[in-house]
Every structure is written in structure tokens, then in C-alpha cells.
Amino acid sequence: MKERIVNLETLDFETSQEASLRPNLWEDYIGQEKIKSNLQVSICAAKKRQESLDHMLFFGPPGLGKTSISHIIAKEMETNLKITAAPMIEKSGDLAAILTNLQAKDILFIDEIHRLSPAIEEVLYPAMEDFRLDIIIGSGPAAQTIKIDLPPFTLIGATTRAGMLSNPLRDRFGMSFRMQFYSPSELALIIKKAAAKLNQDIKEESADEIAKRSRGTPRIALRLLKRVRDFALVKNSSLMDLNITLHALNELGVNELGFDEADLAYLSLLANAQGRPVGLNTIAASMREDEGTIEDVIEPFLLANGYLERTAKGRIATPKTHALLKIPTLNPQTLF
């Protein structure tokens, strides 16, 4: 499948740009109000006690600000933030090297934490509970365990698949937060703030239009903003007005609902099944896409907005999908 403009993965060239647009203070961080409120209380209490924060887990679809909110937490706690990803921690020695380099009250952010191997989790448990690292030297009857004390630290785990976390690991997080999709009005504010940082003039209705097509996700909103800015530059316009914005978004293949070719292909597959559940493996084979991408990238927004139902037997299109695609729902009796 070709590269999607609404793809939720962070592209290499976007990393430095994302950092420049990232909010640095709570007042700059838009959305996730309940999470912000709870975190502000926890941070204030931890600072008064002069302790590290409890370990915390952020889960939800990609692109909703898990990393950004972790940067703000570290800034508020006046401490260091170390960032890594579970696939990079292949051996217990990799984790030991990270943990032994932490200072008191530092924050360790592990992305895709559901991908940690069971062996790595076993090393992590005493580190989280007792701030202790148990290193096994040797093997068999001659094996010895060396205990290394660690400074108190905070582990922030981020995952798009909370259900894949083992129960022992999940239970060791003192706080757990589900990141929600953003409203169009919240996304419009994010877009206008980002445009100002980019020194780009943008009309209110243009920001609203981009927000409407951003699938409730800041990462997509910022990506669309930058692509529309490119169209404005090519047209020698210093202002992103509605005409340029509509032209750019249509050229990018993102419709009024934020759907692209992949979304519509997915929904068409379900709708044409006429009420029969379609298995994930069948969908993946038909779309030539891996199952993880379908579950983590395509489905969450469609599911949250009522375009499909997940059942034990598979996925089913809702009446909303049939109405969108203008595919009539057949009477079940006519299917047999």
C-alpha cells in the first residue's frame, strides 16, 4: 500500500520538526484535560514530598501526544527525560545500562512497552518496585545474583496496545491514563499555534478545515498543516486561505471526514460483506496490509466514530458505513 498522508507513524524527517512544535508548558498543551488535571495534582504532591512520581502508563492510538506530555512532566519535575523504545531493549544488559545511568527522580520513557520480552520484564519488576537491579552472573548451580541499588526514578510506559501488556507489568504502574481523540475545536487551536511557530498566516476557516480532516489526531493535523503550507508556497501565497486548503487536501486524497483511500477500501470490504463478520486476517490479505497496522492505525478512529463493530467472529460494517458508501443493506434472508 502506498504511503498515507494520514499514516500515524512518525516519519524520520518529522522528528526535529515535531520537537520544534511540541508544547513546553501545561498552558500550551491543548486537550486531554482530565489527564492534565490529575497529573498536575500528582506533580505538585511529588514536589512537595521531594519524591519521584509514581510510574505511569499512557495508552491509546498513536499520535495523541504521549511523548509530548512526558516532556512536560519532566520539565515540571525539573528532571531529565530519557527516551527509548521497547524494540531497542533486546537484552537484559541493554536495560541495565539504561537504568544504571539514571539519576534520582529522572524519568524513563519506554515507547511500545507492550513489545518488551518476558525476560526484560523480569529485570524491570524489581527496578520498578524496589529500585533495585538483580543481575544474574553465571548459569546453573554456580549462578549468583548481584543486587544493585538504583536511584528512585519514574517509568513512563506508552503503548497503542494496552491489552498486550502482561498483568504483572500493568499492575506495577501507579497511574494509568487512556489518551482520547481530540475534538475539531482542540485541533484547530493546535493548528493555529503551530502555524504561528512556523511564521505562517492561516485563515480561521482553513484551520477548521484541516482540523475536521485530521482524524482527531494532532500528529495528522500538524502533518496536513505542513503539506498545505507547501501548496500555498508553490502558489506564491503567504496566506493559507480556504481555497488553497481545500485544493491541497483534495490533492492529498483526504476527504471531509479525514478518510483516505485505505479507509474507504477497508469500509467497502466490510459493507460488501452484507452483515457477515469479516476476519482480521481476511481484511489484511485483501488490503495487502499487516494486521497490526489495521488494528492500530486504521480501525481506532473508525471504531470510535461508529463505522464498524468488532465481534468475536470478525468486523461488521454499521448502517453509518452503508449510508456513507451508498451500499444498501440487504435483508439477511436474501443472503441464503
Swiss-Prot record:
One of its GO terms (molecular function) is four-way junction helicase activity. Mg(2+) binds at residue 67. The lineage of its organism: Bacteria, Pseudomonadati, Campylobacterota, Epsilonproteobacteria, Campylobacterales. Gene3D superfamilies: 1.10.8.60, P-loop containing nucleotide triphosphate hydrolases, Winged helix-like DNA-binding domain superfamily/Winged helix DNA-binding domain. This is Holliday junction branch migration complex subunit RuvB. Keywords: ATP-binding, Cytoplasm, DNA damage, DNA recombination, DNA repair, DNA-binding, Hydrolase, Nucleotide-binding. Residues 256-336 are annotated as: Head domain (RuvB-H). The RuvA-RuvB-RuvC complex processes Holliday junction (HJ) DNA during genetic recombination and DNA repair, while the RuvA-RuvB complex plays an important role in the rescue of blocked DNA replication forks via replication fork reversal (RFR). RuvA specifically binds to HJ cruciform DNA, conferring on it an open structure. The RuvB hexamer acts as an ATP-dependent pump, pulling dsDNA into and through the RuvAB complex. RuvB forms 2 homohexamers on either side of HJ DNA bound by 1 or 2 RuvA tetramers; 4 subunits per hexamer contact DNA at a time. ATP binds at residues 21-22, 63, 66-68, 129-131, 172, 182, 219. It is an enzyme of class 3 (hydrolase). Its main location: cytoplasm. It comes from Helicobacter pylori (strain Shi470). Its EC number is 3.6.4.-. Residues 183-253 are annotated as: Small ATPAse domain (RuvB-S).
